[in-house]
Amino acid sequence: MASSVLSSAAVATRSNVAQANMVAPFTGLKSAASFPVSRKQNLDITSIASNGGRVQCMQVWPPINKKKYETLSYLPDLSVEQLLSEIEYLLKNGWVPCLEFETEHGFVYREHHKSPGYYDGRYWTMWKLPMFGCTDATQVLAEVEEAKKAYPQAWIRIIGFDNVRQVQCISFIAYKPEGY
């Protein structure tokens, strides 16, 4: 009798260890453990396929008639106040404002180079010289208005150049021609 009790205890211990090591199947990014469950759990992993729960809200960018110009170019055009705010941010960081314009291709295209990336075939023309020593955002906005008068069918962007590290730190579209 003692041997049967011992063997049944050993078997019971082994089954508890096996149950403790079992891992629930992955059901996406949402954890069901934190919510009370009022229905019976279905442990059949073939019926609980999921793409991750939170992924349901993602959408595909429509490529037709949606040209990409710069970072955040999918947002509506910036108002004058928003432009001034961006320019003040640029100046506050010590970057040199510079205006550039493009009369033909304001969007990404591949003409001379086929690989994607920063060198995407766009070479913009600089408007005058970089505005070294500029401390007023309205001066930059006045230059944008002057460039708009000179080239009304051009895309105009403002870039912030860090002359210490010699890199472009910010770039955004300040003006797009009608119809874009």
UniProtKB/Swiss-Prot annotation:
| Entries under Gene3D superfamilies matching the protein | Ribulose bisphosphate carboxylase, small subunit
Q: Which residues form each disulfide bond in the chain?
A: none
Domain of life of the native organism = Eukaryota
SMART domains reported in the protein's UniProt record: RuBisCO_small
For this entry, the transit peptide stretch runs 1-56
- Where does the protein end up? Plastid, Chloroplast; Cell junction, Plasmodesma
- The record lists the membrane-crossing segments as none
Q: Name one GO biological process term.
A: defense response to virus
Print the keywords alphabetically: Antiviral defense, Calvin cycle, Carbon dioxide fixation, Cell junction, Chloroplast, Photorespiration, Photosynthesis, Plastid, Transit peptide
Q: What did gene disruption experiments reveal?
A: In susceptible plants, increased tomato mosaic tobamovirus (ToMV) induced necrosis in inoculated leaves but delayed development of systemic viral symptoms. ToMV is able to establish efficient local infection but not to move systemically. Compromised Tm-2(2)-dependent resistance.
**Tell me, what is one Gene Ontology molecular-function annotation carried by this entry?**
ribulose-bisphosphate carboxylase activity
Q: Which Pfam families match?
A: RbcS (PF12338), RuBisCO_small (PF00101)
* GO CC term (a single one): plasmodesma
InterPro entries reported in the protein's UniProt record? RuBisCO_ssu, RuBisCO_ssu_dom, RuBisCO_ssu_N, RuBisCO_ssu_sf
Tell me what else is known: The basic functional RuBisCO is composed of a large chain homodimer in a 'head-to-tail' conformation. In form I RuBisCO this homodimer is arranged in a barrel-like tetramer with the small subunits forming a tetrameric 'cap' on each end of the 'barrel'.
Relate the assembly described in the record. Answer: Heterohexadecamer of 8 large and 8 small subunits.
Protein purpose: RuBisCO catalyzes two reactions: the carboxylation of D-ribulose 1,5-bisphosphate, the primary event in carbon dioxide fixation, as well as the oxidative fragmentation of the pentose substrate. Both reactions occur simultaneously and in competition at the same active site. Although the small subunit is not catalytic it is essential for maximal activity. Involved in antiviral defenses.
Tell me its family.
Answer: Belongs to the RuBisCO small chain family.
Q: Which PANTHER family match?
A: RIBULOSE BISPHOSPHATE CARBOXYLASE SMALL CHAIN 1, CHLOROPLASTIC (PTHR31262), RIBULOSE BISPHOSPHATE CARBOXYLASE SMALL SUBUNIT 1A, CHLOROPLASTIC-RELATED (PTHR31262:SF10)
Q: What protein name does the entry list?
A: Ribulose bisphosphate carboxylase small subunit, chloroplastic
